[in-house]
């Protein structure tokens, strides 16, 4: 970590380089100076900070230019505030152990206030200067350097350029966790030789022939050697999602989604689509973690950002880099609940919960007597990852959810992974189609209006969105436009 206080002491030694950059009229430098001059920041204050950021970013301008040079402006004002504090009395400082975090993407001050009971730290968001109608004003912004708290392999910042929304309250987790009663039996002994590739070495995708783990995808790997989802597999999954009636389904005798908890009876099962799975290699396989058939297990690799949208959709997720078609983005992570636990949780909760559950129903119809502890769902309301911020978009979303088999060969439990459906440009929002039927009055998602902005929006009766923005609740289901009646009862 580099202290911003070192910027002022290094100004003289860098003057020659600064002058050279100005003399050469570097276009990128001039654009940065144009922005800071709008805020009445003199060049002699901008240049040393800019050089330090470039050094820290390895000469990469992407983060510096992000959001109209927000990182640069933040850094300049951080240096100013630090200099003022060093000149003044230390009695005015609140808290202890003042630290300056100078990440090129998100610069802010952190006051660590240690508590005897929790040892927690409190982050104080710094004021951010901006222009409004030509006038220089300061506006509060929510800015968190890494919402994952170091639990992912990449940092994922959170920003609110609108400055009107509180940071959402939830516990970030990188892996699914069992809430209470869900039956999840993960055991190497339960994985037979036919369900693993014990004789493989290194990278399975480099072998002459596909291994046993490729059996689920018709004897071919679903991934390319570049780590992307193959186009043919991706297109088939998309067709199944858009035209589910054209593909086989299985039907439950007593479907958990059609259960009336008050009467103890079951309605008719509408069928569960037999989805295409990807089976990844796992611990009993002979390959290593760099195997090309372990894409989802390696976790998030893309540069992502949680941000507050300006289209009435609340918080959203966007990419900070260009992404090719078939790129793995993240899993949908949450608590593993039984269908009954989900029903009870929704009955007890308020109507402003932030997420909807993921129903893991791909194998329900194959069971003669499906036990409640085997009818599982994922709920990211209290604990989850960045997927809880992904907004819905009708018909033309740029991501799709794919079921992934990893730890267990049965389909009571599996992973949900998101892949891009097309090339996605940096700063574009990442979206996926929840398959909501807005004409279904009993559907729980009907509680909010669709603001996706798609020309093919299925909620045509609602135009625009006004009033206070709320974080939208998310849902994905293996069924065609079906929601849990247990959830909808709570919403009535």
UniProtKB/Swiss-Prot annotation:
Entries under PANTHER family matching the protein: HISTONE-LYSINE N-METHYLTRANSFERASE SUVR4, INACTIVE HISTONE-LYSINE N-METHYLTRANSFERASE SUVR1-RELATED
Catalytic activity of the protein: N(6)-methyl-L-lysyl(9)-[histone H3] + S-adenosyl-L-methionine = N(6),N(6)-dimethyl-L-lysyl(9)-[histone H3] + S-adenosyl-L-homocysteine + H(+); N(6),N(6)-dimethyl-L-lysyl(9)-[histone H3] + S-adenosyl-L-methionine = N(6),N(6),N(6)-trimethyl-L-lysyl(9)-[histone H3] + S-adenosyl-L-homocysteine + H(+)
Biased composition (Polar residues): 113-133
Name this polypeptide is given: Histone-lysine N-methyltransferase SUVR4
Gene Ontology MF, one: zinc ion binding
SMART domains recorded: PreSET, SET
Organism: Arabidopsis thaliana (Mouse-ear cress)
Gene Ontology cellular component annotations, sorted alphabetically: chromosome; nucleolus; plasmodesma
Domain of life: Eukaryota
The family this protein is said to belong to: Belongs to the class V-like SAM-binding methyltransferase superfamily. Histone-lysine methyltransferase family.
Residue segments, region Disordered: 112-138, 463-492
Binding site for Zn(2+) 1: 196-197, 200, 204
Enzyme class name: transferase
Subcellular locations according to the entry: Nucleus; Chromosome
Binding residues annotated for Zn(2+) 2, in chain numbering: 196, 213, 281, 285
Record's keyword terms, sorted: Chromatin regulator, Chromosome, Metal-binding, Methyltransferase, Nucleus, S-adenosyl-L-methionine, Transferase, Zinc
Domain annotation SET: ranges: 302-435
The protein's role, per its UniProt record: Histone methyltransferase that converts monomethylated 'Lys-9' of histone H3 (H3K9me1) to dimethylated 'Lys-9' (H3K9me2) in the absence of bound ubiquitin, and to trimethylated 'Lys-9' (H3K9me3) in the presence of bound ubiquitin. Acts in a locus-specific manner and contributes to the transcriptional silencing of pseudogenes and transposons. H3 'Lys-9' methylation represents a specific tag for epigenetic transcriptional repression.
Single GO BP term: chromatin remodeling
Domain Pre-SET: 196-299
């Amino acid at each position: 970590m580099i202290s911003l206080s070192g910027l002022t002491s290094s100004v003289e030694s860098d003057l020659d380089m600064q002058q050279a950059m100005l003399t050469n009229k570097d276009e990128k430098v001039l654009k940065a100076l144009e922005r800071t001059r709008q805020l009445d920041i003199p060049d002699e204050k901008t240049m040393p900070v800019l050089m330090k950021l470039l050094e820290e970013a390895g000469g990469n301008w992407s983060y510096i230019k992000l959001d109209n040079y927000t990182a640069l402006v933040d850094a300049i004002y951080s240096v100013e505030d630090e200099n003022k504090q060093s000149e003044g009395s230390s009695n005015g400082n609140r808290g202890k152990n003042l630290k300056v975090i100078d990440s090129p993407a998100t610069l802010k001050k952190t006051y660590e206030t240690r508590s005897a009971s929790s040892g927690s730290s409190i982050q104080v968001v710094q004021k951010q200067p901006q222009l409004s109608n030509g006038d220089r004003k300061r506006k509060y912004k929510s800015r968190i350097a890494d919402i994952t708290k170091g639990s992912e392999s990449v940092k994922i910042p959170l920003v609110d350029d609108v400055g009107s929304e509180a940071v959402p309250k939830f516990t970030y987790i990188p892996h699914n966790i069992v809430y209470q009663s869900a039956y999840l039996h993960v055991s190497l002994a339960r994985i037979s030789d036919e369900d693993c590739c014990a004789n493989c070495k290194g990278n399975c995708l480099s072998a002459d022939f596909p291994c046993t783990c490729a059996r689920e995808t018709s004897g071919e790997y679903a991934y390319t050697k570049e780590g992307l989802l193959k186009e043919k597999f991706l297109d088939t999954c998309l067709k199944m999602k858009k035209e589910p009636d054209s593909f086989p389904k299985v039907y439950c005798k007593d479907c958990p989604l059609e259960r009336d908890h008050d009467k103890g009876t079951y309605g008719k099962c509408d069928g569960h689509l037999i989805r295409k799975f990807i089976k990844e290699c796992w611990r009993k396989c002979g390959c290593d973690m760099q195997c090309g058939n372990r894409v989802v297990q390696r976790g998030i690799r893309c540069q992502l950002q949680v941000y507050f949208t300006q289209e009435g959709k609340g918080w959203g997720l966007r990419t900070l880099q260009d992404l090719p078609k078939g790129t793995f983005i993240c899993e949908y992570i949450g608590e593993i609940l039984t269908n009954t636990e989900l029903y009870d949780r929704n009955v007890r909760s308020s109507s402003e919960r932030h997420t909807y559950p993921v129903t893991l129903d791909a194998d329900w119809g194959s069971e003669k007597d499906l036990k409640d502890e085997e009818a599982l769902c994922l709920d990211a309301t209290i604990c989850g990852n960045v997927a809880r911020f992904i907004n819905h978009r009708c018909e033309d979303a740029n991501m799709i959810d794919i079921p992934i088999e990893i730890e267990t060969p049965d389909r009571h439990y599996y992973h949900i992974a998101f892949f891009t459906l097309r090339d996605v440009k940096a700063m574009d929002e990442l979206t996926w189609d929840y398959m909501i039927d807005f004409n279904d009055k009993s559907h729980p998602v009907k509680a909010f209006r669709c603001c996706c902005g798609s020309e093919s929006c299925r909620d045509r009766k609602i135009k625009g969105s006004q009033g206070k923005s709320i974080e939208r609740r998310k849902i994905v289901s293996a069924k065609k436009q079906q929601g849990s009646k247990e959830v909808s009862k709570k919403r009535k």
